[in-house]
């Protein structure tokens, strides 16, 4: 009877070992891999680096051009397509929040640029006014100097008349 019990325990231990893989992370299957369009067969025993390369290569060909664009709308469109391929809970709402924040920041930057341009114009007008004021003062000084010189000449003439 004890032999039977030992035999059953041995069978149970062996069956548990057969059910557990030696390396559970050796095979990677994710929903993300299965959703890519370029992969038609299951890829077995891929390494993490290979999995990333397979996902990147499966992206549409125009993505590199769209990601090189400086237009934020292209980035948003790419992210929306990624959310279609790789659904993420709350992903769309988070993207909308980011777009709203971006738009708010951009309008703030545009307002600051407008204020800066107005300030530059006002500064230029002030500098022009100051140069006009300086030249007006110089004109007044020149007139006063010439008037003083004229009066000095007349005084000299009067002195000469008095002396003669």
From Swiss-Prot:
Domain of life where this protein originates: Eukaryota
InterPro entries (alphabetical): Spc34 (IPR013966)
Subcellular location field: Nucleus; Cytoplasm, Cytoskeleton, Spindle; Chromosome, Centromere, Kinetochore; Cytoplasm, Cytoskeleton
Phenotype of null mutants: Sensitive to thiabendazole and osmotic stress.
GO cellular-component term (any): kinetochore
Keywords: Cell cycle, Cell division, Centromere, Chromosome, Chromosome partition, Coiled coil, Cytoplasm, Cytoskeleton, Kinetochore, Microtubule, Mitosis, Nucleus
Stretches of the chain forming a coiled coil according to its record: 104-164
GO annotation, biological process: attachment of spindle microtubules to kinetochore; cell division; mitotic sister chromatid biorientation; protein transport along microtubule to mitotic spindle pole body; spindle attachment to meiosis I kinetochore
Name of one Pfam family that matches: DASH_Spc34
tRNA processing is among the record's keywords: no
Described function: Component of the DASH complex that connects microtubules with kinetochores and couples microtubule depolymerisation to chromosome movement; it is involved in retrieving kinetochores to the spindle poles before their re-orientation on the spindle in early mitosis and allows microtubule depolymerization to pull chromosomes apart and resist detachment during anaphase.
Recorded family membership: Belongs to the DASH complex SPC34 family.
Quaternary structure and interacting proteins, as annotated: Component of the DASH complex consisting of ask1, dad1, dad2, dad3, dad4, dam1, duo1, dad5, spc19 and spc34, with a stoichiometry of one copy of each subunit per complex. Multiple DASH complexes oligomerize to form a ring that encircles spindle microtubules and organizes the rod-like NDC80 complexes of the outer kinetochore. DASH complex oligomerization strengthens microtubule attachments. On cytoplasmic microtubules, DASH complexes appear to form patches instead of rings.
The protein's name: DASH complex subunit spc34
Organism: Schizosaccharomyces pombe (strain 972 / ATCC 24843)
